[in-house]
Design a protein with these regions (language model features):
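N-terminal single-pass transmembrane signal-anchor helix
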Residues: 1-22
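Polybasic/polar functional segments that serve as interface/processing modules
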Residues: 22, 26-31, 167-175
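Membrane-proximal N-terminal amphipathic helix
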Residues: 26-57
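Type IV pilin-like appendage domain
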Residues: 56-124
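Short conserved beta-strand and strand-loop elements enriched in small hydrophobics
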Residues: 138-150
């Protein structure tokens, strides 16, 4: 019995010494979160039944994710409503968990854009791009590259492909 207590104490000491050494990879967490929310936005666009025979512009009701390079946050909205995070039930509105700089100390950079960038998906899942409201008529023609950079200079890119909207995570690059 004494041996069992001794073994438990030793395991407890080792666990207390080892567990604090596991560092969080905040860049990985932020990139996975943004990647999954881009895919979620595309999913919402494809399953949302926005057809309205009384509105000739029904096809312009789209879901989009707006990314701010100034505040390093993002929000998802479409069809007159803000998306709800299925894991937490919170609105994905650019605050709290959706501010990557506050939560993960990570910055967003969208290639070729300044300020707020809108990535919009139509009912077929095709991506449109633009700043402000120009996303309605500008089908994505080239790969869209979103770079996330951690405080230590490490970065990773998320790529959205034209026509299909296929979204992928690139390799992590150290400074």
């Amino acid at each position: 019995m004494l041996e069992l207590v001794f073994v438990i104490v030793v395991i407890g000491i080792l666990a207390a010494a080892i567990i604090p050494r596991f560092d969080r990879d905040t860049l990985y967490e932020a990139s996975e979160q943004l990647l999954s929310h881009i895919k979620y936005t595309q999913h919402l666009a494809m399953v949302d039944n926005v057809y309205d025979d009384t509105n000739q512009n029904w096809f312009q009701n789209r879901w989009g994710i707006s990314m701010s390079e100034d505040d390093y946050n993002y929000s998802i909205a479409g069809s007159g409503q803000v998306a709800v995070d299925p894991t937490t039930g919170d609105a994905i509105n650019g605050t709290g968990d959706y501010n990557l700089n506050d939560k993960y100390n990570v910055k967003i950079d969208v290639a070729g854009a300044t300020g707020t960038y809108n990535l919009v998906f139509d009912h077929l899942g095709r991506p449109y791009n633009g700043v402000g409201t120009t996303a309605v008529n500008s089908l994505l023609q080239n790969d869209l590259v979103i770079t996330l950079t951690a405080k230590n200079g490490e970065n990773v890119s998320i790529t959205v492909q034209p026509e299909t909207g296929y979204t992928s995570l690139g390799d992590f690059v150290s400074p």
